[in-house]
A protein has these predicted regions:
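S-adenosylmethionine/decaboxylated-SAM
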Residues: 16-33, 40, 47-223
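Boundary detector for helix-to-coil junctions that initiate low-complexity/charged tails
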Residues: 1-10, 14
Length: 223
């Protein structure tokens, strides 16, 4: 009897096809494809330059994973150092942008939802063992302790940490080494402090102001 009732209910129930949700893939890198390709070219250019690779300002580690997997496939064996607060911008840097560079309160924010443990786990999940992560405020960390460096990607966004980092990282950049400075775009009102610091640094050292792929400033140390 119960089976008859079940069949009757099944016939009267509305027929609905349940389709699985399609997998939606979103691009999650902070660098555009040509910019990532350029960073890979920088790894090749500095392959034989003595020193480590450094990424100062690494956020959640997407770029670090990409570059380290490239290094693995291309057999570029160098230590890789990743530095970040892993908690967003420090209050002093934000205050400087507001008080000395005229930025409105609330404009400078982001990257707070992060932890060093998450970054380290991302490296492990991708089989990456060479990365040494350092949780620190760039303003307080002696960046010369990272040297010697063959290549450094500097991505700290704001004027105050960028200005200090440029001076110290260039000091320990090996001859023939390359420093890539992100956000060198004066039209980007949020991060234009990076471009100002880059302009001031290159002018003070008599180095060319060279920006490629829209926002990547280059500093080459003569061999």
């Amino acid at each position: 009897m119960w089976l008859t009732r079940v069949r009757s209910l099944a016939r009267r129930a509305p027929f609905r096809i349940v389709r699985p949700s399609p997998p939606i893939h979103r691009y999650f890198y902070n660098f555009r494809p040509p910019q990532l390709c350029f960073l890979c070219a920088c790894l090749e250019e500095t392959r034989d330059v003595p020193g480590s690779i450094a990424e100062v300002g690494c956020a959640q580690g997407q770029t670090a994973v990409f570059l380290n997997l490239y290094m693995e496939f291309r057999q570029i064996e160098k230590p890789y150092i990743a530095v970040d607060t892993f908690s967003g911008f420090v209050p002093e840097d934000v205050a400087f942008e507001i008080e000395h560079r005229g930025k409105p309160p609330g404009l400078i924010a982001g990257f707070e939802n992060n932890r060093k443990e998450w970054f380290d786990e991302s490296m492990r999940a991708n089989g990456i063992r060479r990365v040494q992560s350092i949780q620190a405020d760039v303003n307080r960390l002696d960046l010369t302790s990272l040297g010697p460096l063959a290549l450094c990607l500097l991505d700290v966004d704001l004027y105050r940490p960028m200005s200090k980092a440029l001076r110290e990282l260039y000091e320990v950049l090996s001859p023939g080494g390359l420093l890539v400075v992100d956000d060198c775009d004066p039209a980007n009102v949020r991060w234009d402090g990076a471009d100002q610091a880059y302009q001031e640094f290159t002018a003070s050292r008599g180095l060319p102001y060279q920006v490629v792929h829209g926002k990547l400033g280059l500093v080459r140390k003569p061999a």
